Amino acid sequence: MNFLDERWTAIPQGLDRANLYPYEAPRINFIINRGKIQKLPNKFKFDKRIPILAIGSNRSPSQLLRKFGKLEIIPVTNIIVNNFDVTYASLISYYGAVPATLWPVKGSKLQLSIIWLNESQLKVMHETEAVGKAYEFVKFDNEVINFKSSFIIKGNIFGYVSKFGALNFGSKVFEVRALSAIKAKKRMLKSINQQKALKFLSSKILNISSKKNIFDFRNKVISDKNYRFETIKKL
């Protein structure tokens, strides 16, 4: 793997920030070392770091660089999660993406990441995840995790789940959709990309799904905070 490839470090701007969500992430363990992406040393010491399950954009080096800048050290390791999938949340972000949340799905198995944060980094992450407003900070049961797939983890794993649950794609019965960008080893749900999720959401709110209306809808969500809050209430 080429850690110098700009796709890992280029931070999406403008509408790409929504279109490319949840961004690319290496499928091997790595470390962000003061702005550089490197292979994680085998003898890295995880002492006093808190394991946080990353289900969406937090898996991506570019998103971690956006949130923490180029002065921090953040190790990221792979992990297998059982009986859950990553679905679209019943939310829309301030930059116009339909974000992710974890949803229980019996039989599902997918590869996600653990980001190892110190106390000060965790405070920053809480702020970026809008804890208490958009997401809740939770502790996961150990049976969710396939520990054979991870670095040594002592104690619990924590993470963020949508305060508003998963987005309902059904008309008569409740249906959720997985993020196609998150690859599963075993997936039980239908999956769609970000563009289709946004098209559905704009159609649900506006009852129209032309490209122009989707574009206008997203721009209004980005520019008008109150409109975004009202939209979330309708989901």
Where are these regions (language model features)?
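Glycine-aromatic micro-motifs
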Residues: 1-235
